[in-house]
């Protein structure tokens, strides 16, 4: 697709690019001295006219295939290695508080599609949000905690520090990130990646700005650029900026760096 618009139509150009992003259509812009921010581009010659080709990602073609193969191989190895630990954690969760060991939710993944998300349950079952858990009562308790708590991480979906709904075992799992181990199965099935943006909830997504919907251009990850360099200390806007930076600059080497950095972050209990 080739688009030639003046600088006064910059918003229009942005909307076109966002709409075709998931189709991976090649996108060229014949520029009049301006370009879109936060987008990787390269100059191209089209019939002796200089145009900018906007890239959907730095990771395309064979690199994308390699990333998927990398995800399958290492998630399978990790599942085999950590399976005894996961079974032991599941037992401890059941002993610590009644209810299932696995907490299942619908999250928003690639192309904005819902997928089944797994993690170890870290809250009391009757206080966990979800129709199959605490239901409307749990949702009302969450809203009241948001209003009454003095230490809330702001964003499209606020998060409570020192959340009283979290179990004793849950606090340990969250601090060590062991609650995320079941997501290895999501990686193996292809709904998640080892590295990518944080998987968000449908109620978060409905409040996204147009630009933030770029987060749906790739699979969400167990860990990611924002998780490593900000973890839970970031508000949503800053988290989204880091994840958008990753999407535009991702590569196999950047993924490897993030994975190694994740071990350091988890070890420090950040």
Could you tell me what each predicted segment is?
Residues 1-83:
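N-terminal hydrophobic signal-anchor/signal peptide
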Residues 24, 30-33, 181-188, 228-229:
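Hydrophobic alpha-helical segments characteristic of transmembrane helices
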Residues 34, 42, 102-164, 223-241:
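Short, glycine-rich, amphipathic interfacial segments at transmembrane boundaries or analogous
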Residues 47, 58, 62, 162-165, ...:
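Residue-level signature of the cytosolic catalytic core of signaling kinases
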Residues 51, 166-170, 241:
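Residue-level signal for cytosolic alpha-helical hairpin/rod architecture
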Residues 63-139, 186, 252, 257-270:
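A hydrophobic, helix-centered structural microdomain
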Residues 144-219, 258-266:
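A short, structured surface patch at a secondary-structure boundary
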Residues 210-269:
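C-terminal or late-domain output modules
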């Amino acid at each position: 697709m080739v688009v030639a618009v003046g600088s006064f139509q910059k918003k229009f150009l942005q909307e076109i690019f966002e709409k075709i992003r998931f189709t991976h259509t090649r996108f060229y812009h014949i520029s009049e001295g301006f370009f879109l921010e936060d987008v990787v581009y390269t100059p191209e010659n089209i019939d002796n006219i200089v145009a900018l080709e906007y890239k959907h990602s730095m990771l395309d073609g064979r690199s994308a295939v390699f990333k998927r193969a990398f995800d399958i191989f290492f998630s399978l190895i990790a599942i085999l290695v950590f399976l005894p630990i996961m079974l032991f954690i599941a037992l401890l969760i059941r002993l610590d508080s009644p209810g299932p060991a696995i907490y299942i939710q619908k999250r928003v993944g690639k192309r904005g599609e819902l997928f089944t998300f797994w993690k170890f349950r870290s809250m009391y079952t009757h206080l966990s949000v979800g129709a199959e858990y605490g239901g409307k009562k749990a949702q009302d308790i969450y809203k009241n905690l948001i209003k009454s708590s003095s230490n809330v991480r702001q964003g499209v979906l606020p998060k409570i520090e020192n959340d009283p709904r979290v179990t004793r075992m849950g606090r340990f799992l969250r601090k060590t990130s062991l609650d995320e181990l079941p997501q290895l199965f999501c990686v193996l099935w292809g709904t998640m990646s080892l590295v990518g943006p944080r998987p968000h909830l449908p109620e978060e997504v409905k409040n996204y700005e147009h630009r933030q919907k770029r987060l749906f251009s790739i699979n969400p990850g167990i860990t990611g650029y924002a998780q490593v360099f900000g973890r839970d200390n970031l508000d949503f806007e800053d988290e989204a900026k880091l994840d958008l930076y990753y999407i535009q600059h991702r590569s196999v080497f950047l993924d490897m760096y993030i994975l190694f950095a994740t071990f350091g972050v988890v070890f420090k209990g950040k």
